[in-house]
């Protein structure tokens, strides 16, 4: 992608929780112009029009030719199909994690990105979180030997996950 003085025209496909977050952040960036969002849910689409002053597309394929880059925030089972459509349309893409539902689809998306010469990235956004960056420094400097993390989430299906690792056990 060539540097440009004009804002990059971007779109978001899927405006559930993560897609809404992407649209919100993109609408605030001076180097990005949120052209539109695509989602089959008309109610969410109308809310996005009001909130982000952008277009809403019921069919994501109508958004593809209008933008340079797209955030894909649809359910994982649709990542492959939507990702291929965007890459084949010449769009740079950010695909929410995981990249695809299985290894075969992931490899297919990587091959399509390479063939299209488009930029593609998986949305591992936590790596930019200041707390995670500092923790990464601490772990790599071997300043701790035990790490316990708890994830708290309003989403019942993701709540109460517990991960522990004790370096002394290894």
Where are these regions (language model features)?
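N-terminal Rossmann-like dinucleotide-binding module
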Residues: 1-51
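Beta-loop-alpha module in the N-terminal Rossmann-like domain of NAD(P)-dependent dehydrogenases
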Residues: 22, 54-109
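Alpha-helical structural signal in soluble globular domains
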Residues: 25, 29, 48-51, 85, ...
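Conserved acidic residues
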Residues: 35, 68, 145
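A contiguous active-site-proximal alpha/beta segment in oxidoreductase catalytic domains
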Residues: 100-158
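Conserved small/polar residues in nucleotide/adenosyl-binding loops
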Residues: 163-168
């Amino acid at each position: 992608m060539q540097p440009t003085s004009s804002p990059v025209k971007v779109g978001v496909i899927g405006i559930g929780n993560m897609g809404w977050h992407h649209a919100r952040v993109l609408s605030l960036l001076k180097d990005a112009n949120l052209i539109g969002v695509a989602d089959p849910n008309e109610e969410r689409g109308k809310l996005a029009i009001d909130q982000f002053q952008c277009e809403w597309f019921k069919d994501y394929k109508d958004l593809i030719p209008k933008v340079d880059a797209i955030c894909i925030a649809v359910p994982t089972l649709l990542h492959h199909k939507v990702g291929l459509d965007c890459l084949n349309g010449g769009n740079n893409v950010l695909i929410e994690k995981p990249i695809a539902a299985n290894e075969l689809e992931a490899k297919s998306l990587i091959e399509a990105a390479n063939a299209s010469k488009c930029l593609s990235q998986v949305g591992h956004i936590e790596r930019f979180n200041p707390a995670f960056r500092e923790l990464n420094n601490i772990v790599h400097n071997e300043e701790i030997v035990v790490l316990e993390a708890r994830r708290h989430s309003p989403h019942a299906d993701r709540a109460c996950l517990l991960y522990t690792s004790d370096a002394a056990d290894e």
